[in-house]
Amino acid sequence: MTQNLQMADRFDSSAVEQALYKHWEEQGYFKPTENPSLPSYCIAIPPPNVTGSLHMGHAFQQTLMDTLIRFNRMEGNNTLWQTGTDHAGIATQMVVERKIAAEEGKTRHDYGREAFINKIWDWKAYSGGTISQQMRRLGNSIDWDRERFTMDEGLSNAVKEVFVRLHEEGLIYRGKRLVNWDPKLHTAISDLEVENKESKGSLWHFRYPLANGAKTADGKDYLVVATTRPETVLGDTAVAVHPEDERYQSLIGKTVVLPLANREIPIVADEYVDREFGTGVVKITPAHDFNDYEVGKRHGLPMVNVMTMNADIRAEAEIIGTDGKPLTTYEAKIPADYQGLERFAARKKVVADFEALGLLDEIKPHDLKVPYGDRGGVPIEPMLTDQWYVSVKPLAEVATKAVEDGEIQFVPKQYENLYFSWMRDIQDWCISRQLWWGHRIPAWYDEAGNVYVARSEEEVRQKHNLPADLALRQDEDVLDTWFSSGLWTFSTLGWPEQTKELKMFHPTDVLITGFDIIFFWVARMIMFTMHFVKDENGKPQVPFKTVYVTGLIRDEQGQKMSKSKGNVLDPIDMIDGISLEDLLEKRTGNMMQPQLAEKIAKATRKEFENGIAAHGTDALRFTLAALASNGRDINWDMKRLEGYRNFCNKLWNASRFVLTNDKLDLSAGEVEYSLADRWIESKFNRTVGEFREALSQYRFDLAANAIYDFTWNEFCDWYLELTKPVFANGTEAQKRGASQTLVRVLEKLLRLAHPIMPFITEEIWQKVKGFAGIDADTIMLQPFPKVVKSELDESAEMQIGWIKELIIAVRNIRAESNIAPSKGLEFLVRNVSDEQRKILAENDRLLKAMAKLDSVQVLSADETAPLSVAKLVGNVEVLIPMAGFINKEAELARLTKEIEKMRGEITRIENKLGNEAFVAKAPEAVIAKEREKMQEYQNGLEKLQTQYQAIENL
């Protein structure tokens, strides 16, 4: 016999998780080795914002990453999970600006650039560790000594190196072009930071008089121009029509007089114009509209910028040529009464002035999308500004080919199309931002306006042989955050130095990210990496071999989680639990829109009337893995979280059954393995195969389901029960067989589940390892189970599968006939094959114990059975004699109900098959299936009627 141990009744995650994690980290289990002969496996984490906190999307993606990292570590690979945080320029600057405004009533300008940046570093030091601590709570097996920040010295050097090299290659340039301008934050922003909001607006129809006596085809001396933006009229430099629009073909090349400004502008033909929109004539304002900007370039139109950086009307128009340089040969004056007007006040005045001049044709309601800055919260303005750009086309060609050639795989594959659609129509990338927080652009200016690009001011002076007394001013702008994060996979490994880590772990293996940043981050990483990182043969390296694109975690109603909706769930609250009061405070405190607080509080009280219970990290991780389907949207499900917490307890209780069993015998001596022992080993190996196959395809949901199904349905519900008769009445050899199988399968199951459920599996494994004769420190460095083909036993699976069906049939009869589970029954079977007869004989004791049977008897085909309740298991008839058990009235009532149900099904199928439309449209296989079901129901009805007759005759 083996000394059993004590185990608590329930798994207490709060007592285990943080202590275990601390131990793992202190022991260095998360660190890679320096052994270059081991195959390496590396994942670079998408760096979360340094001042942020974990949300469910982070928890979701990081659970999947850690599952892969732990699996590969157990596979014997040298694993590195490279972590770090992003400086998140605009987001972090805004957080600190709001903080000093609220606490001190100051702006960043009161501080000045240097002092304000120091303030951000202080804030980063204070709050920057939050997200790292939360990641530890998730169980992430990260080498924290390698944690990086995008503004660390090493990464900053990599950023400068890339900028300087691209500039030297002529791929970075400075130019005046149109950008998304946030007039509140005073910075250019990326397309990702623009949110298009549906709005009910107007379409104004203005009359532009034709110049020089020209007339339209129907005799009018004006064109009616449709616009949604009257405030930009003063910047018009043309009107456009479609070249094939017969209404206006005769006017192409002629001019109109621009009202209010009184200057002539040409009528141009361009296929961009939609003939069905408005009147088919549109104004072209290249300095204030992205589409017009492209039209202007095609037709060589000047660009007239009429707005200041605040989006007010300028005192004097800025006139730029298509080459981006000031144009002195074109005149465009702004009337005095417009100068200084705020843009929407200018809109009203333009409309009023057109009306006063008799040039307002009509105003129509119009649904439109208005672009807003997602952080400034005001409509963005397309604005002509001096910015730095990367000419990305040459980089994009190489990056596109890498995916076309299969060097990089997208999973699911359809996301390749999204990638290609962007890469094949890529525009130059505006990389400068008018912020203070970020990587300052490594460019310097002298008083004459000359620009010098280098890694430092010292290098500028040396490179260009500049005198020490020549004043140089560094560019005020910083780089787009995506520029530095685009270098993430290689800058974190020490590039531009050729470090051993870069050699060992690059390219990384998989990137796990959301579909929303394929353009903004994934594509740029591929472009930058392939341009700057080469293998020993000079071939461009990819940053990762696979991009696994996850869906978006939404709330239970399918809504996106957001602070303004008040439906954000904190993963730490899923782990530790939270009271209703604290949850309300979290959801309604410090809101940008306090008027929503009452509505949010009401919804929260309804959904979480008792707050949220603690579920532990393993239950959270298992839920996230089980939800990880290939869908684009994934709805969170509290019920599943509860279910998987119960699953953790099921695993704990199964382990208690094994390890506290005083009959467990692991002593030396003769061992006999039963059919059930062979069956559970075979089922375990099939589960290992399913898990490995699922994980190889990034189907974490199927991997989790394989573990769940085996643990709950096979190991706990059946195998543990099948061992009880052995421990009660088996031989010593049979008990040893059951004992060894229990411990062996439990230990392997813990290793199988460990990548998804690290804490509970380590806690139990530490108790199991002694029983299993394992001398090792941690489960995470144990080998991951492999499929052992010699343990696959189809015969055992078939036999136990059939025995299970017989037992279930008896249990169902007990339940339906209201017979106590402890009451012994006679068990009769008819229509069995010779093989089935043999199985019954060999497993007589097992069947009796599991189904609580007094006897097992096989009837011949013509042998009459006593009055019995019958069930069909395949073709085999299971009969339980009812003498002394049955309540005649109750049984007849039950049978009547069953007969009615069966007749209802038959009628339903008859109606279906009698429906000509269904029969005409349905595939033949579907019709055949319905007919097959009909036959089954008719056979079942016949048996029920026979049974009814027999009981009625009692």
Swiss-Prot record:
Annotated EC: 6.1.1.9
| Gene Ontology cellular-component terms listed | cytosol
Annotated ATP binding sites: K563
Motif 'KMSKS' region: where?
A: 560-564
Q: Where is it mainly found?
A: cytoplasm
GO MF annotations, alphabetized: aminoacyl-tRNA deacylase activity; ATP binding; valine-tRNA ligase activity
Q: Where in the cell is it found?
A: Cytoplasm
Kindly name one Pfam family recorded for this protein.
Answer: Val_tRNA-synt_C
Q: Where is this motif: 'HIGH' region?
A: 48-58
Listed A to Z, the keywords are: Aminoacyl-tRNA synthetase, ATP-binding, Coiled coil, Cytoplasm, Ligase, Nucleotide-binding, Protein biosynthesis
CDD domains for the chain: Anticodon_Ia_Val, ValRS_core
What domain of life?
Bacteria
Gene3D superfamilies in alphabetical order: HUPs (3.40.50.620), Isoleucyl-tRNA Synthetase, Domain 1 (1.10.730.10), Valyl-tRNA synthetase, C-terminal domain (1.10.287.380), Valyl/Leucyl/Isoleucyl-tRNA synthetase, editing domain (3.90.740.10)
Please name every pair of cysteines joined by a disulfide bond in this record.
none
Which GO biological process categories is it annotated with?
A: valyl-tRNA aminoacylation
Catalytic reactions on record: tRNA(Val) + L-valine + ATP = L-valyl-tRNA(Val) + AMP + diphosphate
Q: Coiled-coil segments, which residues?
A: 883-954
- Supply the enzyme class, top level: ligase
Please explain the role this protein plays, according to its UniProt record: Catalyzes the attachment of valine to tRNA(Val). As ValRS can inadvertently accommodate and process structurally similar amino acids such as threonine, to avoid such errors, it has a 'posttransfer' editing activity that hydrolyzes mischarged Thr-tRNA(Val) in a tRNA-dependent manner.
Query: Which family is it part of?
Result: Belongs to the class-I aminoacyl-tRNA synthetase family. ValS type 1 subfamily.
- What does the subunit section of this Swiss-Prot or TrEMBL entry state? Monomer.
The UniProt entry, under NCBIfam families, shows: PRK05729.1, valS
Q: What is known of its domains?
A: ValRS has two distinct active sites: one for aminoacylation and one for editing. The misactivated threonine is translocated from the active site to the editing site. The C-terminal coiled-coil domain is crucial for aminoacylation activity.
Q: What is this protein called?
A: Valine--tRNA ligase
